[in-house]
Design a protein with these regions (language model features):
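Short, non-transmembrane cytosolic segments of multipass membrane proteins
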Residues: 75-104
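Juxtamembrane "helix exit" motif at the C-terminal ends of alpha-helical transmembrane segments
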Residues: 143-151
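Cytoplasmic juxtamembrane interface segments
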Residues: 64-80
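Membrane-interface, cytosolic juxtamembrane amphipathic helix immediately N-terminal to a transmembrane helix
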Residues: 23, 97-140
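Juxtamembrane/interface alpha-helical elements of multi-pass membrane proteins
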Residues: 1-66
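Hydrophobic alpha-helical transmembrane segments of multi-pass integral membrane proteins
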Residues: 2-4, 139-144
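Amphipathic alpha-helices that form helix-helix packing interfaces
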Residues: 26-29, 33, 64, 90-94, ...
Length: 151
């Protein structure tokens, strides 16, 4: 029972960390995209193709690229790419990012999304530390109670 509780706590903590790491990686990816649009003037399909190689969030960019290749408008493909993303807050930030207009407007939208994702990742890290302490305290209290009941 103790081992099961410890494994459950560990799984919860790892899942939460993965979501936080994904938000941070998304912020880095969007920052990279904004820089490449600004300096290299790369087209969006090439940018999505590059970001599709990322470990934690590449699948979202790949789905967006797939939608573009099927003929979807950029904004629709972008929103579809991030529809099932976790954490849901990050998905909302990305779906709300408007990729319409000229280069300057797109770069501005990506940069704003980067800042919001970085804030989300920072907030989740702070919450995660507190949640980890509570989980372990609850698990140890439960284990102690179980041992007392056995005695």
């Amino acid at each position: 029972m103790l081992l099961g509780t410890a494994l459950w706590c560990r799984g919860e903590i790892q899942a939460r960390r993965r979501e936080t790491d994904r938000a941070a990686e998304l912020a880095a990816a969007l920052g990279e995209m904004a820089a490449e649009i600004r300096s290299l003037r790369r087209p969006m399909p090439r940018l999505l193709e590059r970001q599709a190689r990322r470990v934690l969030c590449g699948g979202c960019f790949a789905r967006g690229l797939w939608g573009l290749e099927r003929g979807q408008p950029l904004q629709d493909a972008w929103e579809d790419g991030f529809r099932e993303l976790t954490p849901p807050e990050a998905a909302g930030i990305l779906r709300d990012t408007e990729l319409t207009g000229d280069e300057e407007r797109i770069v501005s939208a990506l940069t704003a999304a980067v800042h919001r994702l970085e804030e989300l990742a920072d907030r989740r890290r702070r919450e995660s530390r507190q949640r980890e302490r509570l989980l372990w305290a609850a698990a140890l209290s439960g284990a102690g109670l179980f041992i007392i009941l056995l005695i």
